[in-house]
């Protein structure tokens, strides 16, 4: 039987942020389950980051290097830093069964807009201390 593929969209799991620590803890446990293949779409790092080599699961760096032609698009799009521009490319490459995210709604809402949304299960845990609370709360009522 084929392994279930899980993509975690997040701040790179080796950074020193709350989201990164949470992600590292979750992915390190999921990685140990033989039935799963896990990867992360790692925000705020580019392909030259040395930590990618030592990460035991797949890593798709979100940030282009300055020499890439996509760098100007990345710098010109405020939500590109959260994965907006690279998400669909990663979906096509990794083809996850499940996409997970634990950030603020405005950091992950592009995942709902993806043209590939019907092809993955979406497990999100948006924080509730963020703005805009009224709009976010309506999503779950």
What residue spans do the PLM features occupy?
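N-terminal subdomain of nucleotide-sugar transferases
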Residues: 1-49, 53, 94
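Extended catalytic core of nucleotide-activated donor transferases of GT-like folds
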Residues: 54-141
